């Protein structure tokens, strides 16, 4: 497991109080992990803080699954390194 995904999983487990086994790449924050809209906002804020990134509201709405978050954060950090 890559470092980004590991940190994302830790944040989700801490914020949502779910079992680690449920936090798989295809798991939906709302449908599979039981997050509500406030939880989703808190997850986005934690991702921004942990990875020192900015996630716009438009992008946040598209981050539905664990893998969506992983792919976006990975791309953001890769793009950030190239500057």
From Swiss-Prot:
The modification O-(pantetheine 4'-phosphoryl)serine is found at residue 37. 4'-phosphopantetheine is transferred from CoA to a specific serine of apo-ACP by AcpS. This modification is essential for activity because fatty acids are bound in thioester linkage to the sulfhydryl of the prosthetic group. GO terms for biological process: lipid A biosynthetic process. This is Acyl carrier protein. The gene is acpP. Pathway: Lipid metabolism; fatty acid biosynthesis. One of its GO terms (cellular component) is cytosol. Keywords: Cytoplasm, Fatty acid biosynthesis, Fatty acid metabolism, Lipid biosynthesis, Lipid metabolism, Phosphopantetheine, Phosphoprotein. Belongs to the acyl carrier protein (ACP) family. Residues 2-77 form the Carrier domain. It comes from the Bacteria. Carrier of the growing fatty acid chain in fatty acid biosynthesis. Pfam families: PP-binding. It comes from Karelsulcia muelleri (strain GWSS). It is found in: Cytoplasm. InterPro entries: ACP, ACP-like_sf, PP-bd_ACP, Ppantetheine_attach_site. One of its GO terms (molecular function) is acyl carrier activity.
